[in-house]
Amino acid sequence: MIRFDDFLAHADKNRLQRFIPDFERVLDERYYSRTHGDYEGWWNALQQLPTAQASQIQFDVDTLMIGAEGDLDPEEQESLIKGLRGLHPWRKGPFNFFGNHIDTEWRSDWKWTRVAPHLSPLKGRFVLDVGCGSGYHCWRMLGEGAQFVLGVDPSPKFLFQFHCVKKYAPTAPVYYLPLRSEDLPPNMDAFDTVFSMGVLYHRRSPFDHIDELKAALRPGGELVLETLIVPGDENTVLTPLDRYAQMRNVWFIGSSLATKRWLERCGFEDVRIVDEGVTSLDEQRQTDWMTFQSLKDFLDPEDFSRTVEGYPAPARAVLVARKP
């Protein structure tokens, strides 16, 4: 079983020390006391990854590079591919493991390219990434010089995909906990930068989520919020009747201006809308490493500007704000 002793040991030496009992309790409740039917298969897939020294590791590039092809012999390469395939579908990336390109469903590097120019420099910062997926952006944050990165996401498969990288960078100060933002200790006031990318619309109460993000930030800290949006003014909010782009767990999608107002209502200052754009079929698509349905299947085949339910097609915005 994947354990989190390394995170707790690191937390014992930094500003999260006083929250260790809270983390231990919630990990027991949300992870150790629960079992997923596919856990054994995912664990076996992770064990297929060869024990090898990666001759290169690069986290400051669009495709995260772990090792080189020549680091593994043919038998090890075969075992590596078997293990990585055992964790299909790969949704967030891309990665390159020892010469093997993992073409993920999402071009998460494109999102980072949109977000990164608007950030306060991450060098030396204490960073939280809520809804971190496979951890791709966590590693990019480390590549920008972050001192400590904590990613949280409740998906157990993403946890295993994260550990495919962590296996070859075990001492990197990047950690993943299989938790939701609402599971985090309250009022931490600990992080210099908090990211929430692709989470807000999945929450029944967007205000509760924003408050959780604010509580994790230190005074003066920076929030980076990336979320779905719809066209409209500060009063425009879409509440799907059932599904949105085939997703059942979408509750509220505000316009950029409405989302900005939500942040201001929750007490954030210097709120800026720094990027807006429609999600393209090149950014989210089916690949050899994600063979299920993707964005194209969720849009009206006669009109790609609408979802199959008739709503505006997915568009996204990035907002940056400061906690007073």
UniProtKB/Swiss-Prot annotation:
Pfam families: Methyltransf_9. Transmembrane segments: none annotated. It is an enzyme of class 2 (transferase). Its EC number is 2.5.1.-. Carboxy-S-adenosyl-L-methionine binds at residues 92, 106, 111, 131, 153-155, 197, 201, 316. Keywords: Transferase, tRNA processing. Gene3D superfamilies: Vaccinia Virus protein VP39 (3.40.50.150). Disulfide bonds: none annotated. SUPFAM superfamilies: S-adenosyl-L-methionine-dependent methyltransferases (SSF53335). GO terms for molecular function: methyltransferase activity; transferase activity, transferring alkyl or aryl (other than methyl) groups. GO terms for biological process: tRNA wobble uridine modification. It comes from the Bacteria. InterPro entries: CmoB, Mo5U34_MeTrfas-like, SAM-dependent_MTases_sf. Belongs to the class I-like SAM-binding methyltransferase superfamily. CmoB family. Homotetramer. This is tRNA U34 carboxymethyltransferase. It comes from Hahella chejuensis (strain KCTC 2396).
